[in-house]
Regions:
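Charged, low-complexity helical/coil segments in non-catalytic cytosolic or luminal regions
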Residues: 1-173
Length: 174
């Protein structure tokens, strides 16, 4: 059954719309970073020297820059296409993109855009900001941080909309 379904004519092609964003980010960060401090002390009850470890929080700061090229955000509302499935489709190979031609859609299903440019850009910026937090933590001298503050700037913002191909195969499992 599965072997028979693997024939290429059982795959159904369709196009999913995406917004692709390219931008450069630069941000300054500041956070309290945990440092382990080991101390020796004299325990008068046992009349011996002992060692204890404590956490000392120190302020650190830094700056990070990163370039994003073709950062994809789905143009399909999450209610229509499961985000978990969608996440497993990404990344696409973007090296062979071609300019849109309506003839490419002849005989192939394509979803229309549900997500407009402003909402897609807001999603991209939110996701990039989450990644920036991880970049800031990685830039710190220890991954245990608190009170993280980020001041981020975007530059060279560009966008385009894409139809990316997906193939679906359905088979019945017995």
């Amino acid at each position: 059954a599965l072997k028979d379904s693997a024939r290429i004519n059982n795959f159904v092609p369709f196009y999913i719309p995406f917004w692709a964003f390219s931008t450069q980010i630069a941000f300054n960060w500041e956070a309290e970073v945990a440092h382990t401090v080991t101390e020796r002390y004299y325990d008068s009850s046992s009349k011996s020297w002992k060692t204890r470890t404590r956490i000392e929080w120190r302020w650190e700061n830094g700056n990070v820059q990163k370039t994003y090229t073709n950062y994809l955000v789905s143009g399909v509302d999450a209610k229509r296409l499961n985000p978990v499935i969608l996440k497993n489709l990404i990344p696409f190979t973007m090296d062979n993109l071609v300019s849109f031609d309506p003839d490419y859609l002849v005989g192939i299903n394509a979803n229309a855009y549900d997500v407009d440019l402003n909402n897609a850009w807001a999603t991209a910026k939110s996701n990039i900001r989450d990644e920036a937090k991880d970049l800031a933590v990685a830039d710190a001298s220890n991954s245990n941080v608190r009170n993280l503050s980020i001041d981020m700037n975007y530059s060279n913002e560009r966008w385009r909309y894409l139809f990316l191909p997906v193939f679906i195969a359905v088979y019945q499992f017995e």
